[in-house]
Amino acid sequence: MQFRASIAAAAGLFALANARIYGIAFPETVKAGDEVEAVITTENYIQAVQDIAIAFGIATEASAYPETLGNALGSFYLGPEESNTLENITETVTIPAGLAPGQYVVAAGLYSLYGASSSPTLSHYNVTVTVGNVTSETYVGSQR
């Protein structure tokens, strides 16, 4: 009987788990015109976070300015279904067909509400990728 109570208590603690998004990952090399999986990476966190939406963009290294997206690749509603989860989130984006081979920056902007008072934040992430002849299966992640 005491064992069941312990399991019930542990299950209650797991239900209270909090997590946040801390970055993105993208194929190291992408082919223009391909659909690719953008990975939104998550981790344990001390308080609840409501992730509202994320948008992805791509720009040449020369035109990539801090906290900008460049040409939009897509935006996605996250909401309660994809907030406070320890499982990475995957969204599909299409690389523009007309991109010339070379180095590009893929950026993301994330809108979230933090804590009991729902403090709004806008977080920015980016990774450098190569546009080439094939989309790789190796992913590169944003730095913290």
UniProtKB/Swiss-Prot annotation:
InterPro entries per record: Nis1
GO CC field: extracellular region; host cell cytoplasm
Keyword tags: Glycoprotein, Host cytoplasm, Secreted, Signal, Virulence
Superkingdom: Eukaryota
Keyword Ubl conjugation in record: no
Signal peptide: 1-19
Subcellular location: Secreted; Host cytoplasm
Biological role: Secreted effector that induces necrotic lesions in Nicotiana benthamiana. Interacts with the host receptor-like kinases (RLKs) BAK1/SERK3 and BKK1/SERK4, inhibits their kinase activity and suppresses INF1-induced pathogen-associated molecular pattern (PAMP)-triggered immunity (PTI) in N.benthamiana. Also interacts with the host receptor-like cytoplasmic kinase (RLCK) BIK1 and inhibits its kinase activity, thereby inhibiting PAMP-induced ROS generation. In PTI, phosphorylation relaying by RLKs and RLCKs is critical for the initiation of downstream signaling.
Protein name: Necrosis-inducing secreted protein 1
Organism encoding this protein: Colletotrichum higginsianum (strain IMI 349063)
